[in-house]
From Swiss-Prot:
Catalyzes two activities which are involved in the cyclic version of arginine biosynthesis: the synthesis of acetylglutamate from glutamate and acetyl-CoA, and of ornithine by transacetylation between acetylornithine and glutamate. SUPFAM superfamilies: DmpA/ArgJ-like. Pathway: Amino-acid biosynthesis; L-arginine biosynthesis; L-ornithine and N-acetyl-L-glutamate from L-glutamate and N(2)-acetyl-L-ornithine (cyclic): step 1/1; Amino-acid biosynthesis; L-arginine biosynthesis; N(2)-acetyl-L-ornithine from L-glutamate: step 1/4. The keyword Transferase applies. Substrate binds at T205, K234, T245, E341, N484. This is Arginine biosynthesis bifunctional protein ArgJ 2, mitochondrial. Keywords: Acyltransferase, Amino-acid biosynthesis, Arginine biosynthesis, Autocatalytic cleavage, Mitochondrion, Multifunctional enzyme, Transferase, Transit peptide.
């Protein structure tokens, strides 16, 4: 999350707000590194994993975080020198991008992904609105990390590392601390689960738990070969992506061409990170980067995963990897929503029956930003009228307006219980229906809430291969307001 000091807020506060200790992480600047992971979140933190070959991960504390915090605040993820590696990234579309976004965008434009071997990131300072000096700090951070990645070399190696910042805006990076900390960071590089989990901790700000996922997969062209993918991510507030909200670093040992990697990442981001929202604010620092080194490729075969932009159909490997990557990145993105500031509910919104995926996704995103709906869910009220209200205005002023996409007489709204029983209808073809209040109450007591909006309820049973737009969000609580309003003592 990125915060800019709000001068004067403390002068109008009559009394300090109460914030539970495990949320006093970034607003109070003094406890994230010293606070335990809340019991309700511990199940989301893996105790082991399967990590891609040929990647080294390291983290260290260089003093960007306040005194007394020992958690890492500088991390580096890099492919070993012997592997031919490429990179890709999706970046925020916010008109006030942080220096890291500008520098990484320039690297991608210059390299077209070829030769990109690593990602360096820091927490606690967003390096936002810091002018040309801030840009030079980001460039220096990238160059110094590049020297480590290339084995203290020069030239291309110095322009091989993408850079990320997260934290407070309006402050200069402690670039001297960072550069002086690189030798220790290099010594801390390794391949174990502990290395990965510490790197995930190193990019946390208001997060209450580190976010890490990994899995193995195969490709149709070499079903006997097992590939791996791993990713770390962060975020708990200022979440409504348009990349491209959050930071994410993903690595795979599958062999992929640079243009294919960028296409795969962009498509997957559109159906994962770009489908989450907490409060509807798009960050200035959003970035998800991906590296592929082919280290697990059979017989040293390089780059079998490719695509032809002019082809009507892609290769089987491309299609299989795309499907896997969408699922994997969705898992990472959902961890961000699980950690939404003050959240008590994880909400899935499914929109069915839209003529196109973009139209359905837009509708789902509007519902996900509805304060009335989200506060209603916090109060354990399904609030179907709130869903319909958001649905009704969702297309106003958009390219989808006036095309008959929403027809009240064919629109139904239901909630899907987590126990696998039949969905519970609240609206049927534009009319409220009588519901089983006992069942409805039980449904809203659950942590996970799933809403289904069917724009073309024609009685046909929904099939799994039918396309739908899915969005993930959380409730808005008293705690959320308190956390973001706590600028007192």
């Amino acid at each position: 999350m990125l915060l800019i000091s709000r001068i004067g807020a403390r002068h109008i506060r009559k009394k300090p707000l109460h914030v539970e200790n495990h949320y006093r992480s970034f607003t109070k600047f003094d406890s994230f590194g010293n606070s335990p992971i809340p019991a309700s979140k511990q199940r989301f933190v893996p105790t082991s994993g399967t990590y891609p070959k040929g990647f080294l991960v390291g983290s260290t504390n260089v003093g960007i975080k306040p005194d007394g915090l020992s958690q890492p605040d500088l991390i580096l993820v890099a492919s070993e020198k012997k592997w031919e590696t490429c990179g890709a990234a999706v970046l925020t579309k916010n008109e006030f991008p942080a220096a890291s976004v500008v520098v990484t965008r320039d690297l991608l434009k210059k390299s077209k992904g070829r030769g990109l071997r690593g990602v360096v990131a820091n927490s606690w300072c967003a390096n936002l609105l810091t002018g040309e000096k801030g840009l030079e700090d980001s460039r220096n951070m990238s160059r110094e990390a590049g020297r480590i990645v290339s084995g203290e070399g020069t030239g291309q190696g110095e322009e091989s590392v993408m850079v990320m910042h997260t934290g407070m805006g309006g402050q200069r990076l402690r670039i001297d601390n960072i550069i002086q900390g690189f030798p220790n960071l290099q010594q801390e590089m390794g391949t174990t689960h502990d290395h990965w989990i510490e790197a995930a901790r190193g990019i946390c700000t208001t997060d209450t738990f580190p976010k890490l996922a990994s899995r193995t997969f195969t490709l149709p062209s070499s079903p006997e070969t097992t590939f791996s993918i791993a990713g770390i991510t962060k975020g708990a507030g200022m979440i409504h992506p348009n990349m491209a909200t959050t930071l994410g670093i993903i690595c795979t040992d599958a062999p992929i061409t640079p243009p294919a990697l960028q296409q795969l990442l962009s498509t997957a981001a559109d159906k994962s990170y770009n489908c989450i929202s907490i409060e509807g604010d798009t960050s200035t620092n959003d970035m998800v980067a991906m590296l592929a080194n082919g280290a697990a490729a059979p017989n040293n075969a390089h780059f079998p995963v490719d695509f032809d932009s002019s082809a009507e159909s892609q290769s089987e490997d491309f299609i299989a990897f795309q499907r896997m990557l969408i699922e994997f990145m969705a898992d990472l993105a959902k961890l961000v929503v699980r950690d939404g500031e003050g959240a008590t509910k994880f909400i899935t919104i499914r929109v069915r029956g839209a003529p196109t995926y973009p139209a359905g996704k837009h509708i789902a995103s509007v519902i996900a930003r509805s304060v009335l709906f989200k506060t209603g869910v916090y109060g354990k009220d399904p609030n179907p009228i709130g869903v319909l209200a958001a649905l009704g205005y969702s297309l106003m002023g958009t390219e989808f307006a006036g095309k008959g996409i929403i027809n009240p007489e064919s629109t139904s709204v239901s909630f899907m219980p987590v126990d696998g029983t039949d969905e519970l209808n609240f609206v049927k073809k534009g009319r409220l229906v009588k519901v089983d209040e006992v069942r409805a109450k039980k449904l809203m007591e659950e942590e996970d809430v799933e809403v289904i909006v069917d724009l073309r309820d024609d009685g046909r049973k929904w099939r799994e291969d039918d396309e739908e737009a899915v969005y993930w969000t959380c409730d808005i609580t008293h705690e959320f307001v308190t956390i973001n309003g706590d600028f007192g003592n």
